[in-house]
Amino acid sequence: MSIWNDMGMVYALLGAAVAVFLAGAGSAIGVGIAGQAASGVVTEDPSKFAKVLIMQLLPGTQGIYGLLVGFITLSKIGLLGGGAADLDPQTGLLILAACLPIGIVGLISGKAQGQTAAAAIGIVAKKPEQFGKAMLFPAMVETYAILALLISILAVTAIQV
């Protein structure tokens, strides 16, 4: 069977890949940005390690969300735990479109959350007692990643295969 006969599956797999790769890249960038700030703080005051580590981990959730949508997509098209579905190109494109929100928002919000977490790490460096307040700033960015996760999950699961 030629790949041209399986374009629906190709589009669906591309959707899963977009969700995982873009959201994962956003998390990697964000965690890296926050990690650079955290390293400087821990060098000066090792007692702040736990607090800045929590801040550094916050941008990592976008990658988890993308992976979740990727798994749901692979399960939906039958590549996990069953035979592969026979997808027409239109259905494959619908699945690809359903995966875009978490991929795109995960990439952008992961980086933005890393920048916000780095600023919050600066707050913790100067005033460790303000940890709770500082954590709210990167958590606000998280809201939009959660909204994108929700719409991608709802859209992928609503598509009839």
Regions found by a protein language model. Give the residues of each.
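Hydrophobic, small-residue-rich transmembrane alpha-helices and their short perimembrane loops
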Residues: 1-161
